[in-house]
Every structure is written in C-alpha cells, then in structure tokens.
Amino acid sequence: MKLTKLLTYLMAEPVQNDFHDPDITSIEMDSREVRKGSLFVCIKGYTVDGHDFAQKAAENGAAAIVAEKELDVDVPVIIVRRSQRALSVLSDAFYGQPTKQLQLIGITGTNGKTSTTHMVDEIFKKAGRQTGLIGTMYIKIGDETFPVKNTTPESVTLQKTFKKMNDEHVDTAIMEVSSHALSLGRVHGCDYDIAVFTNLTQDHLDYHKTMEDYRQAKSLLFSQLGGSFNHEKPKRAVLNADDKASAYFEKVTAAHILTYGIENDADVMAKQIEISAQGTSFELVTPKGTKQITVSLVGRFNVYNVLAAAATGIAAGLPFDTITSALEELQGVRGRFELVNHNQPFPVVVDYAHTPDSLENVLNTCKDMTEGKLFVVVGCGGDRDKTKRPKMAEIAVRIADEPIFTSDNPRSEDPLAILRDMERGVEGTYYHSIANREQAIFFAIANAKKGDVVLIAGKGHETYQQIGNETFDFDDAEVAGRAIVELNKK
C-alpha cells in the first residue's frame, strides 16, 4: 500500500523530510523488525520509548516513521497526537479492515473472560461457524494455536491475526478484551458486533489507579459499538444484571442490550441451581426457551460464565437447542478450576484466581466440597496492585483452614516483602508463609488427608514463574502432580 493512501486514514501528512510516496511493506513498532519499506511507529511504553529507536529503524530501511514529536532522522516523519492510536488505525487500514468481514465478539470484565470466551467459541462451533479465538492462553484459528504475550495483542498483531482469519475463512472471532488494551487504544478499528461484560471487581489498580478509571476503560468496549442501527450487521451488548457496573455501560452504548443474571431479573437467568463436585445443574431461562441443563463445571461463578455465553449465543441469533447442547458438552478450561488427579484421596484444584473477588468465589466453591480441611496456596504478583495483597490474605484466612502464602511471579520485587504486605492483613491469625512456591505446594499436598481439599490459586494455566529479570518454567498442575506422586509413595 502506498504511504499517501495509508495516511488518508490518519488525515495526516509528512511534516518532516521529503518523500516519493513509497510502498509500505509492513507496519512495525519494534525497530529490530524493521526492513526496507517498513513504516515504523514510535510507541512510548512503560520502560522503553520507541522514539529513542527511530534512528535504528531508519538505518534498517524504514520508509517512513510515525512519531509524537520531530526526530533527527533522514526519512519522512508523520507527527501525530497519539502514536498508539495511530498504530491501531494504520494497522486496520494496512490489513484491509479485516474485522468488517467477521462477526466480532469482545468479552471484557475482571474475572471470567477466558472461560466465557472458550464457552462462546464452543457454542458457535456447534452452530457450524468457523471460529477464531484471541485470549489469555493463546490465539486459535480453526484448530491451529499460536502463543500470545498479552491478553489482547498489540494492534498491529491483532489486525494481522484478523487478516489471517479472513484468509482461513473464519467467519466468527471471539476475543478477550483487556482494560489495558481499551485504554491504550489497541482495539481502535475493531468493528465489534457483540460486546460482553462479565463483572467488575478490584484488579489492575497499579495501572488504572481508581475503580472509576477502571470502569471507564471497560466501558470503551460498549461505546465502541457505535450509534448506528445496521440490520445487516446489528450491534448487541450483553450485560451482567447482577453487577452494578452494567448500569453505567448501558448508558454509554446505543446497541440493543441483553442481560443475564441469577439474583436480579434478567433476559437470561439460572434458577434452581444445584452444585456438586461433579458439576452444576440449573434451569436455563431465556427469551428463546427454558431448559434444565447440567454442565461439568463447578461453582456459582461458572454459572455466570455459562449465562454470559448463552446470552451471547442468543444475541447472535443462534438456535436455543444448539446453545444448550454445546453448554452440556463443555469441558473445563485449563487452569480454571482444573482438577489434578493422580489417585490421591482428596481433590486438588488449580485455578487462575488472582483477584480478591475471584479468590473468594473459588474458595467458597471449594469450601462446599470440603468435609475436612480446606488448604489454599496463594500469592500476589510483584510490580502489580499492592492494595489487594492484604485483602487476598484476609480472604484466604477467613475461608480456608490452612492458608499458605507464597510467591506468584514476584518480578522485580523481593518475594519476602510481598509476603509481608499480605501478612499485614491477617496479623494475629493462623497461616503459613513459604516463599518458595514449589515447596508451598508440596507442603499443602503432603499435609492433606481424605476429606480435605487443596486449592492452588493464582497462576492457573501459566507455565512460568517470573523472578527478577528471569523467567523459569513453572506449572502449578505439573508441580502438584509431582507432589501427589511423592505422597502416594508413602
């Protein structure tokens, strides 16, 4: 694509250095990836400023550079107010606005995004759709998966992925949309058809600072649905009637709204809920029909995820029988209330719960399954919201019988300092502190007996532990498996 054509989407022109309207061969935000013909966009990140690498990009063959200020380089420079937003617009244009050829479903919220995204994917596949998925665990196009760095990729990677979905004849894309991606503008240019809200509880306050700012960031997904009423590509918002943030989201969108819930009156509801260690049964009540269903997932929090997925299917006009059939065939998502079974006499659960609300939910579910003692291994991430550390500890001590505090990606922080932050919330109470996560897991499993339950919280599907500047292989389920094998030898 010619540079002048690409710049029409920005309504911008080069203001520094002459140019001869080169062909743009790629869009890059990493100077190391720049080749002859690349358009380099300078992004100011948390620790690195792309403007500092503009000269390197020029030396590597950049045809032009997008920046927020003038630069000392010999290639054309396009100055914009916000280069992150410009990157989104340019990426969308460069790859041919690929989301216009998809039914695009965005799912946002503090907890439940990953589980709900996978449930929606299963429902749409059951309906005969060719699906793509973008989320915390991976990117999936058809049956092929690719690794990810962020819950929501950078905009150039995102649009490139959507273009690949177009090429692979995908018709429906389901994606997790993080608050970071929304506030940074990574998803500008994405033509969402259905926006889904799970819940809003404390998380990411290291970035958003206040819950109001956090809510505002989440609301951008719903305002991004636009104000038009296109019957060929209708817009829908799916909101949790039991979460007070939904009232705010309802105000910022012109899209048709479908609600779901358990407590408050909603379009899609679960009634007569019965939860056991084997699964959950309830009456699914919807505008399309009512049916008693049983899912293999455990916990009230999972009922909300199922309702959100069902409401999304209804919002898309899928047959009710297809939706319920897909839900009843659901398998668990890795790291989300994942049972680790090596013939030990007690359940061991691995779960991604890393916020106060999600930890309380999963602990209460485990408590209902516990005849003896409830063990929980839990930590708090380094370089993240410090205010939730004492809250997480208080919840663990209040609900569990054997709370064990440990490390969970301490990053640049001292693991012992993180533990001290947690302990400030539970002074004078009973708990264990074991900084080494592997030792903490082994301790819990070695001391559990028949009738007990062991919950390993915080990392879920993650297969690494970040300590300092290094990343080590670490998988809670694998470590738990080894601990159980050791226990079984005794």
From Swiss-Prot:
It is an enzyme of class 6 (ligase). One of its GO terms (molecular function) is magnesium ion binding. Carboxylation is probably crucial for Mg(2+) binding and, consequently, for the gamma-phosphate positioning of ATP. Pfam families: Mur_ligase, Mur_ligase_C, Mur_ligase_M. GO terms for cellular component: cytoplasm. Disulfide bonds: none annotated. Transmembrane segments: none annotated. The lineage of its organism: Bacteria, Bacillati, Bacillota, Bacilli, Bacillales. This is UDP-N-acetylmuramoyl-L-alanyl-D-glutamate--2,6-diaminopimelate ligase. ATP binds at residues 109-115. The modification N6-carboxylysine is found at residue 218. Keywords: ATP-binding, Cell cycle, Cell division, Cell shape, Cell wall biogenesis/degradation, Cytoplasm, Ligase, Magnesium, Nucleotide-binding, Peptidoglycan synthesis. It comes from Bacillus velezensis (strain DSM 23117 / BGSC 10A6 / LMG 26770 / FZB42) (Bacillus amyloliquefaciens subsp. plantarum).
